[in-house]
Regions:
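N-terminal Rossmann-like dinucleotide-binding module
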Residues: 1-44
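Structural motif corresponding to alpha-helix initiation and N-cap regions
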Residues: 18, 50, 72-76, 93, ...
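Short beta->alpha connector loops
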Residues: 13-16, 68-71, 91-94, 265
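Conserved beta-strand segments of alpha/beta enzyme cores
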Residues: 7, 30, 61-63, 106
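Short active-site oxyanion
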Residues: 6-9, 83-87, 218
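N-terminal glycine-/serine-/threonine-rich beta1-alpha1-beta2 phosphate-ribose binding loop
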Residues: 41-85
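Donor/substrate-binding cores of folate-linked one-carbon enzymes
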Residues: 15, 26-30, 37, 86-209, ...
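Internal anion-binding site segments
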Residues: 202-324
Length: 324
């Protein structure tokens, strides 16, 4: 079979999926349709915003389907009418069985972790939050239970100590596109071999979950270790960002603050009071954790833009400040 003879439907929504879709198209595969989320109102004018995947598909004149309900009979029949051989899913919704069982060659998904570790909605965030030094991407065939299907292939990448989740996201986006193309090549030339996720038990005896990130997940508990808090900030930056509330004897009390960049203070700290803010000179902010002190390098006060600590201090009046 030639690339142009393999009819593919691509299902995805965010920027993370676009690089893989672009690689599929530019390498001569036949993407007959794209499925993505409906346009959403955005901004003050509530103008409809197209998903990054839709924007790309429109630019390439690829038909776009935007179902509200993936079980809708009209949508399912429209999907079936394309006669696709294969579905490729990247950063999309959970698919009903009637959809993922449709193509004769199956439906494979690209997941941003080394499965079976970090099944769930936010694998990149949790790998950084947990202080991992390695992560990766996995392609696997869909089955009933989410993120549990047989593995086609995996590729790994290092997480550097200074990386935040945005850095790792971009690295995995590129690596994922390479793996998607490699997986399609195996399907096309008949060299595909899969392994159950249990085959990776020697390196992942207790798979960790990667649940969706909620506002409560992002709230900093200053009673935790300095390493834990530092990794939480890294794992949520630049979006959605770790946050805390200023409590002090001045005008900023009760204001929310987002924290984007931190650094562990290597000097020994004594008499720690978790949450206490300490202004060092005119340009540094330190906060006590349970076992050490964390320097806040970039933050955003509620209603203001994000800024370095020195700029924040020039405009902020802090009186016995604490973070809660």
């Amino acid at each position: 079979m030639e690339k142009k003879d393999l009819k593919i439907i691509f299902l995805g929504t965010p920027e993370f999926a676009v690089e893989s879709l672009d690689k599929i198209v530019e390498n001569g595969y036949n993407v007959v349709a794209v499925v993505t989320m409906p346009d959403k109102p955005a901004g003050r004018g509530h103008n409809l915003l197209q998903s990054p995947v839709k924007q790309y598909a429109v630019s390439k004149n690829i038909p776009v389907l935007q179902p509200v309900n993936l079980k809708d009979e009209d949508f399912v029949e429209q999907l079936r009418s394309y006669g696709a051989d294969l579905f490729v899913v990247i950063a999309f919704r959970m698919l009903p069985e009637v959809v993922w069982q449709m193509p004769r060659l199956g439906t494979f998904n690209l997941h941003a972790s080394l499965l079976p570790d970090y099944r769930g909605a936010a694998p990149i965030n949790w790998a950084v939050i947990n202080g991992d030094t390695k992560t990766g991407v996995t392609t696997f065939f869909l089955k009933h239970e989410i993120d549990t299907g047989d593995v086609i292939d995996r590729m790994s990448v290092e997480i550097n100590p200074e990386d935040n989740v945005g850095d790792v996201h971009d690295r995995l986006m590129s690596l994922g596109a390479d793996l998607t193309l490699k997986t399609l090549g195996k399907i096309l030339d008949g060299t595909l071999e899969t392994k159950p996720q249990s085959a990776f038990a020697d390196e992942c005896q207790s798979p960790r979950p990667a649940p969706k990130i909620f506002k409560e997940t992002c709230h900093v508990d200053w009673n935790r270790s300095v390493v834990d808090v530092h990794n939480l900030v890294r794992g949520l930056s630049p979006y959605p960002a770790a946050w805390s509330i200023i409590e002090d004897d001045g005008p900023l009390t009760g204001r929310h603050v987002k924290i984007f960049e931190t650094q562990i203070d290597s000097s020994s700290s004594t008499n720690l009071i978790p949450g206490r803010m300490i202004v060092i000179g005119k340009d540094k902010i330190a906060v006590d954790c349970s076992d050490g002190r964390l320097l806040i390098k970039k933050l955003q006060l509620q209603g203001k833009k994000a800024m370095p600590a020195d700029e924040f201090l020039r405009g902020a009046k802090l009186v016995n400040p604490r973070l809660i």
